[in-house]
Amino acid sequence: MFYDRASKGEIAMSVNINIRNAVKRYGNTTVIENLTLSIRGGEFFTLLGPSGCGKTTLLRMIAGFNSIEGGDFYFNDTRINDLNPAKRNIGMVFQNYAIFPHMNVRKNVEFGLKNRPADKRIDKKLIHGQADKFLKLMQIDQLADRMPAQLSGGQQQRVALARALCIEPDVLLMDEPLSNLDAKLRVEMRTAIKEIQNSVGITTVYVTHDQEEAMAVSDRIAVMNGGVIQHVGTPKNIYQRPANTFVATFIGRSNILKGEMEVEGGKAVVSLPTGYKAAFDTVAPENLKKQPVTLCARPEELIVETGEGEGLKAVIDSCVFLGLNTHYFVHLLSGEKAEIIQESSIDSIIKPGTQVRLRLNTEKANLFTQDGSRNLLTGVENDLVKEAV
């Protein structure tokens, strides 16, 4: 008889995924080399990065759709390298939905259960009941008799997700599932997906290049570039204390400035363009030394002020009023360009051509080595480093 773990009140489908020293090659080209990653049972884990970074390749290696040229993949204690994809008990949601156009919604959702191996088949009544449960969970039970051509993009994606979950997989894999939806529907669906994942408790690996989407749905994120994982952490950790300048500039927007760090009275003082000096209290003790540095300041971490005083000297090039916030685009007198997001004032907006000064919020801004490869501040939490130890 089919065992319904979710209805028993258990934490269903909670499987750890452990990847050790993974290698993927296409001919003589190595696209992933010596990649190690641990995904916790029940978490919503996102692989985030630009096109061609290897995120979908890694997802397909987990699924069994791509060959593995090196390393080990585990679901809990079971090594899955040579396990047939059909026996991995995974649910997969694709970018193009991949629902069957000749089947109605109910038949699509029931498909996985009806086509299980002979030793795992269940009674038709149980299949019907299981489909009902996930049709209701996805709020598409009223569409059960419709054909895919009669559905909107969002409804089709709900069908694809219901079909993937109906087999009660150990792992749910999602490859850019929202990229074909319009902006408003993407926001609605990402909220629905996160709520459903929380209620079901399934280990979920999600692929996207959309930073905001990743921040909204994920328990943790792995930022990838060139087949290499750069940073693994919570959305908050990755945004506030990125491991390197790639992560800092890929997650959100950042202004990059070169500076020189010196130590005065046991604290770091960074000399920046136009003669502005900023004191940092959060440089890690082992990094407190005279050295060239790279400063990363997000638009909201710079404050525009007029009049005399300390700050980076700049000129307003243009501004965009967006209600709550105003975006200022400036150039420093030393030549660099910067963007600032500031809460809109009840008074007039600062006009283009006005000379201003920019003050830096040193509690939030980040300092990196000159080459940008390492964050020099305390509070950087990178689970990738912990896993490698």
PLM regions with names:
Residues P85-G91, Q95, I99-F246:
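ABC ATPase nucleotide-binding domains
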